[in-house]
Amino acid sequence: MEVDIYPLRSPDLADAIEGALGEGSLFHKTHGYYAQGVGPGTAILPKDWLTRVHRVQNGNTNDRIGYCVDVVDLFLSKAVAGRDKDREFCMALLEHRYVSSPQLLELVPSMPITNEEQRALRARIRRWAKSQRDVGHDMPNAQHLDK
């Protein structure tokens, strides 16, 4: 398992994160997961993604504060990337109803991609949601899938 860490206020720390917590590190061997330091260009996210992050702070974080990208923004980023592993992840998010296609389609215009890429992204979301519906998974508000 991996975790991407983006040091928002200090992007130059991404390499240090990779070295200390990256794949094959002592941290990875000890805890069974690793972290990759990422920068602002690693993921394509909707313009307003920072308004939807989730704050994480508790005893497990030694009361340090971290923010997690909202699942809708994560889905869109992975759908734009379009790799096989991203498709599988996105399909699981749809199947288990962590996201809905209307919710996703509403955010497509805020993606910093070309109009043509936005059209392709909308088609991909509809295709994936329709394939989930067609194998028997409940897709709420799925009327738009047959258009």
What annotation goes with each model-predicted range?
Residues 1-147:
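Compositionally biased terminal segments of proteins
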